[in-house]
Swiss-Prot record:
This is Protein B. It comes from Striped jack nervous necrosis virus.
Length: 75
């Protein structure tokens, strides 16, 4: 579960970097609108909130420990 959380965190960082780069390009080209900025910001915030909820659930309900399977007895 920790690996999943680390992957989510990494993707969120990449998403935020992509968002910033996209905004820089759009502003440089003069083609950005307030609605588009708000939509992109909402998407980033939603992804971040989902990751926080996942981390909270993982802390509340940790993954069960792996149990070694016992060999079956045959007659």
């Amino acid at each position: 579960m920790e690996q999943v959380q680390q992957a989510i965190d990494q993707h969120l960082v990449e998403l935020e970097q992509l968002f910033k780069m996209l905004m820089d390009v759009r502003v440089a080209l003069g083609g950005v609108t307030v609605v588009q900025v708000n939509e992109m910001r909402t998407f980033v915030i939603s992804a971040s909130a989902a990751a926080q909820r996942l981390r909270a659930l993982a802390r509340r309900y940790p993954a069960p420990l792996a149990v070694a399977a016992e060999p079956m007895e045959t007659e």
